[in-house]
């Protein structure tokens, strides 16, 4: 068909998931979820930095690996003595144990008490990237010299599990071997819950999020306030209370931990007005969008929503892909891109959850330093929004429309007689949504041209 202006008429508009959910969501909240951080001492990341630390800062004339062990031994002893003096349980993790499940009772008890505290210390043996040394071939009569390299070694680590009345649950993991790398974990939803309670905003919680809220706009404003400073203040507050391998003199000389992003989860939660609608919509959405991992779709999702006009190269180690994970009764749709992925699943049976999981900020053209968290979150939120705009909505997803439900489900007439349902897609049922009164909500399926009666 040709328009009167000579241009070809556009085909029928593609109905997206964003079109279908409009008008059927009672709460739409975007918030950082899990934030997993690396802590590193910048001045100890090179062999020259190691030599300078011991020789020039600590005054050791011969820099050798023998200097590492006394610091680690003292740190391990200080942690155990500190835990015993404060009545903090020390738990040794075994291989294959789920640490979160082991520590959950301790964190729940601390949350019930409502008091900030270290709830437990976990001990484990894990592979860490640490400094090792090899003796150089030098004059036997002269001073020994060593070459320092970083290698993966199985060493002891301490998990310090914390309940903070402002942040919620979290942990700090400290390696006991030089250069003492650190990991830290917090949850943005848990922080937002405590801020909402402090502000007097009523809400109903999901297992990790919000199911309802008295003031959605105020809740979203709280979620938007989660910043690098929020995490940095929490980290410094608890590091000041813990025994550490580095001293205050080391800190004054610039030897202290800086934080960078190891993994971030930026989520969007859409709570439906009816859990029946939520499940039906999600199941149909899965069937319609099994090709999201194709290069052309991944390009739309992860690259600013624009096609770049050149072939999209697959990431190293594998191509683009879509993967369906099933754990118990939870089904998750995963779309992979480089080291990151986009997840979509049904949260607690009532909400559609979308999460952009970034394992390398460079995938989104961001730097790793914690100060870049706002930029990374903005880009991840845009990806979450583009997912619903990219997903196509087929016939099954139209079940969220009350009009379609009335057509495709049996009803009772005014005389009490049962009227049979019309099968969705049947020629007789297609004109019905188009003939419905203007006040009724229309299904996206009704936007197509009605067939002849």
Enumerate the predicted regions with their spans.
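Short, Lys/Arg-enriched N-terminal segment that forms or immediately precedes the first helix
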Residues: 410-422
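Amphipathic alpha-helical protein-protein interaction segments
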Residues: 422-425, 441
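Short, leucine-enriched amphipathic alpha-helices that occur as contiguous helical runs
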Residues: 425-433, 448
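Short, locally clustered residues in the helix-turn-helix/winged-helix DNA-binding domain
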Residues: 434-441
